[in-house]
């Protein structure tokens, strides 16, 4: 059987040198957008992917903001790699939480898949950069069920709604410059 270039191991890939035809290398870099602490996958997700024959590369410290250490990812089969460049160079699919920053867009390549929240309307230069990269970008917020439901956007909307009340309550406190009011009364 001839192996296509897509299925050959690239020199920059950590770990094994042989690749199966159906294996996908999934990469997860550390989020670099200001005030973003989430990670695009949990150890449970890594275990599921590796159980189905895929490789998962996690950048060192990618889960730290979510209180997930590298050892937790490695314990379920992830390969921990030192930098974002290692993730982008080897991964067929890159998973992120937020839209890629310009330095990340520069690392994307034709044929690579990026799966993340994009929200590109506010970022025309980044949108053009994604087009120019030749990568396929899939926005979480556009994944739609036949019913029209947006299963990847709904949980974020619910969290935002709950956080709005909490943030509002904080700003009513005197130390935050508010009038010292309590939501719900005393």
Each language-model region and where it sits:
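Glycine/serine-rich phosphate-binding loop and adjoining beta1-alpha1 elements at the start
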Residues: 2-5, 11-25, 31, 102-186
């Amino acid at each position: 059987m001839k192996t296509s270039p897509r299925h050959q191991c690239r020199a920059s890939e950590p770990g094994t040198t042989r690749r199966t035809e159906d294996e996908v290398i999934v990469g997860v870099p550390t989020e670099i957008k200001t005030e973003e602490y989430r990670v695009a996958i949990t150890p449970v997700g890594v275990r599921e992917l590796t159980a189905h024959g895929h490789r998962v590369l996690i950048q060192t410290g990618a889960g730290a903001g979510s209180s997930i250490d590298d050892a937790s990812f490695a314990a379920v089969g992830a390969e921990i790699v030192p930098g974002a460049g290692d993730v982008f160079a080897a991964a067929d699919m890159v998973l992120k939480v937020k839209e890629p920053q310009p330095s990340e867009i520069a690392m994307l390549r034709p044929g690579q898949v990026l799966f993340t929240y994009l929200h590109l309307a506010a970022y025309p230069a980044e949108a053009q950069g994604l087009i120019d990269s030749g990568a396929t970008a899939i926005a979480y917020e556009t994944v739609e069920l036949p019913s029209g439901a947006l299963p990847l956007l709904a949980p974020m909307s619910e969290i935002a709604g709950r956080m709005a009340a909490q943030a509002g309550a904080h700003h009513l406190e005197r130390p935050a410059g508010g009038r010292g009011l309590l939501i719900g009364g005393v």
